[in-house]
């Protein structure tokens, strides 16, 4: 019994050391811009952008093959942060190809749901709950708004709705200046 434990421990230690040496010897440095872009992306690896995960999108953005608006779950805030890194600012804080919109979540009309499980399988964050041939519903706190489930639904029972404001997601509006409050403009 002790011989087996000692031999397994020695084998584990030897293979661990071998993996450590291989990791150092065959390490490939990634460009720092790719790491910076990947750090800004949500990291859900949902594939809504059409790339294999957030790392693939970050590599494509660093090469200029993908627009900064490709990440739908990240929304406008992520697109603005990405525009600052890849230096494609649309001018004045605007991001080309992205309107300023409220975040959305999926909503299932339960009377149209057939329980086919296609939306359940496509959801990258497991925000849809339900069983086979049973009614499904969406957990709004877990939904990232990637709309993958909407495309997968054969009965069009899923729609995108504006994310409801809760105490977790509510923020004060940006204060207006005195000129904006009076409706006057500053003379140039």
From Swiss-Prot:
Family label: Belongs to the 4Fe4S bacterial-type ferredoxin family. RnfB subfamily.
Main location: membrane
Coiled coil regions, renumbered to chain: none
4Fe-4S ferredoxin-type domain segment(s): 104-133, 134-163
Localization terms from the record: Cellular chromatophore membrane
Taxonomic lineage of the native organism: Bacteria, Pseudomonadati, Pseudomonadota, Alphaproteobacteria, Rhodobacterales
Binding site for [4Fe-4S] cluster 3: 123, 143, 146, 149
GO CC entries: plasma membrane; plasma membrane-derived chromatophore membrane
Keyword hit for Translocase: yes
InterPro entries linked: 4Fe-4S_dom (IPR007202), 4Fe4S_Fe-S-bd (IPR017896), 4Fe4S_Fe_S_CS (IPR017900), 4Fe4S_Ferredoxin_RnfB (IPR050395), Elect_transpt_cplx_RnfB/RsxB (IPR010207), RnfB/RsxB_Proteobac (IPR016463)
GO MF annotation list: 4 iron, 4 sulfur cluster binding; electron transfer activity; metal ion binding
EC number: 7.-.-.-
Subunit record text: The complex is composed of six subunits: RnfA, RnfB, RnfC, RnfD, RnfE and RnfG.
This protein's name: Ion-translocating oxidoreductase complex subunit B
One Pfam assignment: FeS
Cofactor(s) it depends on: [4Fe-4S] cluster
Annotated function: Part of a membrane-bound complex that couples electron transfer with translocation of ions across the membrane.
Residues at which [4Fe-4S] cluster 1 binds: 46, 49, 54, 71
Keywords, sorted A to Z: 4Fe-4S, Electron transport, Iron, Iron-sulfur, Membrane, Metal-binding, Nitrogen fixation, Repeat, Translocase, Transport
Enzyme category, top tier: translocase
Region named Hydrophobic: 1-23
Residues noted as binding [4Fe-4S] cluster 2 in the record, renumbered to the chain: 113, 116, 119, 153
An example Gene Ontology biological process: nitrogen fixation
Keyword Membrane: yes
């Amino acid at each position: 019994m002790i011989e087996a434990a000692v031999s397994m421990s020695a084998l584990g230690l030897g293979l661990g050391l071998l993996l450590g040496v291989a990791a150092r010897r065959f390490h490939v440095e990634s460009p720092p811009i790719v790491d910076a872009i990947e750090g800004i992306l949500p990291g859900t690896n949902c594939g809504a952008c059409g790339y294999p995960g957030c790392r693939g999108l970050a590599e494509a953005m660093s090469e200029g093959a993908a627009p900064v608006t490709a990440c739908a779950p990240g929304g406008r805030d992520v697109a603005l942060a990405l525009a600052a890194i890849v230096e494609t600012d649309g001018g004045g804080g605007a991001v080309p190809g992205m309107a300023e919109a409220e975040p959305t979540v999926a909503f299932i009309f339960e009377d149209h749901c057939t329980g086919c499980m296609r939306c359940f399988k496509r959801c990258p964050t497991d925000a849809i709950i339900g069983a086979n041939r049973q009614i499904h519903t969406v957990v709004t706190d877990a939904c990232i708004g990637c709309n993958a489930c909407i495309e997968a639904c054969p009965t069009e029972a899923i729609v995108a709705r504006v994310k409801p404001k809760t105490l977790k997601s509510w923020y004060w509006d940006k204060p207006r200046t005195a000129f904006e409050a009076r409706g006057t403009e500053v003379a140039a």
